Amino acid sequence: MEEGKQFRLTFSSVSGKKVEADFDGGVVTSDSGVLLAREMDRKIGVIDCLASALWDRRHPSYVSHSLEDLLRQRVFQLVCGYEDGNDSDALRSDPALKIGCDRLPLTGEDLASQPTISRLENSPSRPDLYRMALAFGELFVASYKKPPKEIILDLDDTDDVVHGSQQLRLFNAFVDEYCFMPLHIYEGHSGKLITTILRPGKRPTGEEIAAILKRVIRFLREAWPKTRMIVRGDSHFSTPEVHDLCEDSPRVNYVLGQAGNKTLKQLGKPLMNQVLKDAEDTDQSVRRFTKLDYQAGTWRQSRRIAFKAEVTQGKANPRFVVTSIRNRSAKFIYKFYCARGRMEGFIKEHKNYLKSDRTSCSRFEANQFRVFLHSAAYVILHALREHALARTELAKASFETIQLRILKVAARVRERATRVDLHLPTSYPFKDLLRTIVMNLDTA
């Protein structure tokens, strides 16, 4: 009996006829949209750039799959929503994925198996990972046709809960779980990824944040000497080390949340009292802003604070933002700070849609490598949305929507003497959209 016939599925009948399914449909893929990711990567060179950062320690005589092939296979699986390395066994013969990895769908050699992918993930050394981090910086810089006048360095961390005995997993009392706490840095205007650094499961100290930021700023400054940079983050990034680093770096400013304390609340008390009175008189929410000058005991100098005095539903809601920008109003600074809410969306796409919290390797370096693989998938999907989906109904779509509508498309694959044909479903509802995307890719 043929393998596909062994798994016959039975459903409710329709019009008196049995409804059955099997896996004997022939050479059909569920992910023909991976070819879009392939075309995008050929234009921006994510895989080649990352592969050049790795040192292949394998004996050349025993290598069946190059580093480029392995990276391409693993990253394209992530792009299509297959976050588990074990999926490689089921997908190594997938015709669309083989085309994506520059192999013929039927006569080409199958892709790597799960054990080979596992060896790949455990092979990078710390110098390899450092070079990969630099490669992401190079990809970020190359994504601009000319140096931008201004970029925003949005930084935030997120909990990555683990359930094993991974190296450097720590118990985090706030999360109430053992976890990692990876640091994400994106460009705030565009959502482009700059870097993702896996960290132990605790809040970073000011020295740790400043050490990472210093490398990022130095790298970008070498590429763009005249570009203005603004570091933006919430209150646990507001440390003397970060303030001093930004103030000592040319054309670098910061806008950071500042935790309230007795001194700050006392400085803002006159405005807060006025807002409380106005809210009581009008029985409405009231919000006002002002600038304050404040110097904490650990700060080397006084700094500007944008203070928001707000009363909502009868309750006071004071908020403070510290900044090195002195020629803007407090209201502007606060609104600029609040715009960092987009950062949560960037992390959501990286962590939830691309499943970058699958850090289940024992070695810390292997888990950092996994995070970088997910970051590569993020860069490809972001570029696809920015260039190929521009001016379409998916121009602002989430990665999840992009996967469902244009990547998860079934196709029958035929390999001929001089070409490869993919026959997509006649009932596919987004034909015109797909044509537009392919045309945009041609001109990207």
Language-model features, listed with the residues they occupy:
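Short, surface-exposed basic-aromatic patches at helix termini and helix-loop junctions that form
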Residues: 243-252
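Acidic/histidine-rich, metal-coordinating catalytic segments
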Residues: 156, 227-238
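Short acidic (Asp/Glu) and glycine-rich catalytic loops that position anionic groups and cofactors
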Residues: 13-19, 50-54, 95-99, 313-317, ...
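Short amphipathic alpha-helical "interface-anchor" segments enriched in bulky aromatics
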Residues: 40, 88, 330-369, 373, ...
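Basic, amphipathic alpha-helical segments enriched in Lys/Arg and hydrophobic/aromatic residues
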Residues: 356-427
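An anionic, glycine-rich sequence signature occurring as long contiguous blocks
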Residues: 2-23, 253-352, 438-444
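Short, glycine/acidic-rich hinge or "gate" loops at secondary-structure transitions
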Residues: 90, 104-106, 228-230, 389-398
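Dynamic "connector" segments at or just before major functional cores
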Residues: 1-204, 208-223, 248, 385, ...
